[in-house]
Amino acid sequence: MNPSKFKNALGEVKKEKFLNCNVTTVSTEGRYIAVNGNFLAMSWSNMGEIVVVDSSSFCSVKPDQPRIKGHRANVLDLEFSPFSSDLLAAAFDDCSVLLYKIPEGGLTEHLTQEVQLYQKHMKKVPFVTFNPVASDVLCTGAFLGDIHVWNALKGETYVELKADDTPTSVQWSPSGSLIGATTKKKNINIFDPRANKMIMNQIINEQFQAAKFGWLDNEQFVTTSWTKNKEKKIRLWDIRKVKDDLSSEGEVTSIKIDSSTTVTTPFVDKESKLIYAIAKGESMIRTYDYSSGTFIKGIDFSGAEPSISTVMFERKCLDYNRLEVDRFARFVNSQKVYYISYTIPRRNQGFDPTLYPPVECGEAALTYDQWVEGQNAEPIKKEINTIENKFVSKVEVFVKQEAKVEVKTPEMKIKELEGKIAEMSVKINQLEEENAKLKKKKKKKKAQKTEEEHVEIQQDEQKQEIEIQNEEEQPQEEQPQEEEQPQKIEIQKEEEQPQEEQPQEEEQPQEEEPQEDNQE
């Protein structure tokens, strides 16, 4: 596989977040949160309580949020079953491990009853992990090196193993046949649980900080540990090359991370061979590509807040249409949980099968009894476009059912092409007919529009003619009225004035005459 396809994987924080996550901060080497395609589980600040929400429905967690409660002890580790997304295992500091069954659709009320209780450890239990191949096989690691393998259905111990010191990380090999545990004694112990023996005890660390590890395949694993020069490195080991216990044999290659003392966990994508170095208390994620057989430094991701707990999604939960190659859920100081998505930057996004080898589909290859009897198997994997799972991208190409492969002869291919050509010609004829109809409609509308415009123009012309006629007729009617009026007034004045003055002149002499006679 070409390393250039993955070395440029770019991490980006998704905008959506879970808020008001009052997650506990009890000191532990385990995980405060667990995630799968259905649920996100968080160990709550109240002793023994676990909040479970829909992993795809981002929300602000309410104070009265339904939760798992009833067991009065601090949660030290959480993990969902790879075969039953509703089965949650929780390890506690009172030496007990409980299994809870989440109802379909999530919690609608407080869950107080577990489906299984395991109390065979004598010390705190910071690690719980499911077998990746066989159903109902659980491994738990406790203080002072007690490692138990037990039946999850019955709560019965199958075997008790003893590490050389308190474990700092515990993991099954990809085939579920071996168990690895790094310890505070600077070593890694490899166990064959069905043979009830330690098959390897290797020195991997030369400083006092806790080392962590992760399986690359069934024979190789990577560690994050320190050298004598206090350099923190990612180192690749091969168990086939180790001949003696407590030796430094088996190291294949390494690459320096930095010189800090923060405990760093390697998260390994076994399909793409990408390795993510994530330190508790740091915001950065360093990426390394080992697909070519040597470590190639990738692009670092730098977040805004330091990580308290980070977990990795299963590959079947990724969005293949966005070319997403990995995704993490991270809990930070500000009581938030957000997702970090790693994608391959491309101009044209879309499903690229070369980026996605077959992935584990969530089906158990063995039962508990088959595994105990000594049967071996690899995880069941399927091509991405054959997985029927609601967490996989909803694009049809990714969720179509598995089809039988049909070998086609040249004649069959020719017939198939001829059929496609015939279908295309029919479609072309249909489109041409539709186009002709549209053109007719367009012409008809245009003709109607021109007629309407012509009528409007005629109406406007008629209006203008009427207005002009009115303007011409109006002055002829008004002019004679203006001329006649002053004539009438003058005639009236002439007639009225003489009639009023004449009698006055005649009356005056008549009044004076008698006065003269009297005087005489």
How would you label these PLM feature ranges?
Residues M1-E29, T264, G281-E282, Y290-E423, ...:
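Terminal intrinsically disordered, low-complexity extensions flanking WD-repeat/beta-propeller proteins
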Residues Y118-S309, E314-C317:
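WD40 beta-propeller repeat blades
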Residues L87-F92, L99, H121, V137-C139, ...:
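Generic alpha-helical hydrophobic packing signal
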Residues R240-K243, T253, K400, E406, ...:
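N-terminal non-cleavable signal-anchor helices
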Residues G48-E49, T168, I204-Q209, F213-D217, ...:
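A general secondary-structure boundary signal
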Residues M1-L153, V159-A163, I204, S225-K228, ...:
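WD40 beta-propeller repeat fold
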Residues G11, E49, I147, I188, ...:
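Residue-level marker of intrinsically disordered, low-complexity segments enriched
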Residues P410-K413, L417, I421-E520:
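Charged, low-complexity intrinsically disordered regions
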